[in-house]
Amino acid sequence: MISDFAESCAYLMNNLERQDMRSVPIINAGAGSDEHPTQALLDMYTILRTFDFDQTADKQSSFVELQKTYSELTRGPANKTYLFCGDIGRGRTVRSLTTVLSQYENVRVVFVSPEHETLRLGDDLRRRLHQAGVAVYEFHSLDAELDGKPLLQQVDCFYMTRIQLEYGSSDEKGEIESMDLSPFHLTKQRVDLLKPYVPIMHPFPRDSVIQEIPPEIDSDPRVMYFRQARNGMWARAALLIHMFGAADDLFMLYDEFYGD
C-alpha cells in the first residue's frame, strides 16, 4: 500500500508542468528502457576527464605526442567520433549520453547493433540527433568500415552496452538468444585496432554469458568502465549537493579540514 501510494505521488509530481510547484526535487535514476540521466552525468564526467588528456588512458603518450600521429585530435568532447555497440534500441544509457554529446560541435555518432527491430537505433533518437546536427552512422558489425578504413580505427570513444534480455516478450528473448552475437563482442583482436587514447566504456552490469566484453580486456590501459563506476559515486553526490543547495557548505568544510 505504501509503495503504491509513493509511486502515485512521484508520478503526479513529475507531471506538474511547473517545477516550482513540486514540493520536493525528483531525480530520474533510470526509467526502464527510456532514459538514464544520472548515468549520462557520470559518463560525461568520465569522458571530460579522459579527453582532458592530463590523465590519459595511455599514460606513456602525452597529448603533444598523440597530436604528432593524430593531427586533428583536440581536447574535450567536441570533434570526436563516438561508437555505441550492443542494445541500441533499448539502451537507456545510450539515449541519455548521446543527447548530451549532441550539444558539442562536430560530433559523429556510430551505432553498431544486431539487425533486430528492438535492438537497432530507433527513429526517435535518430531524429533527435539529426535535429541537433549530429552525423549518425549505423552498422551491424564491429568489423564494418568507415571512410574506407576499419570502423574501429576511426573512433575516439568506444561505449559498449549489454543485450537487455529482461525487456520484451519471451519470443523476442528466444529470437535474440538464437542470434550470432559474435560481431558485437569486443575481442582482443578488435581492441588492438583502437587508437591508443580511446576510452573503453560500459555502464555495467556486463553479461557473464554473452560476454560482450570478456574479462581478458579488463587489464587494457584504455579500459574506463571501472573508473566509470567509481565516478558514479562522485557524480551522484554532486547532484545531491546541488539539489539541496549545499555547495557553499561543502566548500566551507573542505577549507576547514584541508585548507592551509
Where are the predicted features?
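Phosphate/diphosphate ligand-binding glycine-rich loop within oxidoreductases
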Residues: 1-54, 207, 213
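Short, charged/polar "capping" segments at the starts of alpha-helices
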Residues: 2-8, 92, 116-122, 208-209
